[in-house]
From Swiss-Prot:
InterPro entries on file: bL21-like, bL21-like_sf, Ribosomal_bL21
NCBIfam families reported in the protein's UniProt record: L21 (TIGR00061)
Top-level division of the source organism's lineage: Bacteria
GO biological process entries: translation
Species classification: Bacteria, Pseudomonadati, Bacteroidota, Bacteroidia, Bacteroidales
Species of the source: Porphyromonas gingivalis (strain ATCC BAA-308 / W83)
GO CC, any one term: cytoplasm
Record-stated family: Belongs to the bacterial ribosomal protein bL21 family.
GO MF annotation terms: rRNA binding; structural constituent of ribosome
UniProt keyword terms in alphabetical order: Ribonucleoprotein, Ribosomal protein, RNA-binding, rRNA-binding
Listed name of the protein: Large ribosomal subunit protein bL21
Oligomeric form and interacting partners: Part of the 50S ribosomal subunit. Contacts protein L20.
Amino acid sequence: MYVIVDIQGQQMKVEQGRRLFVHHIKDVESGASVEFDKVLLVDNNGAITVGSPLVEGAKVVCEVLTPLVKGDKVLIFHKKRRKGYRKLNGHRQQFTEILVKEVVA
């Protein structure tokens, strides 16, 4: 059984027992329980239920494993030819690691 759930603007395929890295969730601690109720699709062993836009009564219960994980550094380099203009910026995205405990459909 799997569901497609909207977590902070991103659609993810979720199954019970799976670990996910989602965009940073503010004000949560390690071991806290988080629920996501924006379920868009439910596949229960071949029986597919598509919401319009959401499936009523379905939710995903997760446990926070690591509240703050930093992703790899992405470098952004700007240059204008023949002018000596060079600029380098970097960015590290913050994530939260969660474990899917239960899928209620």
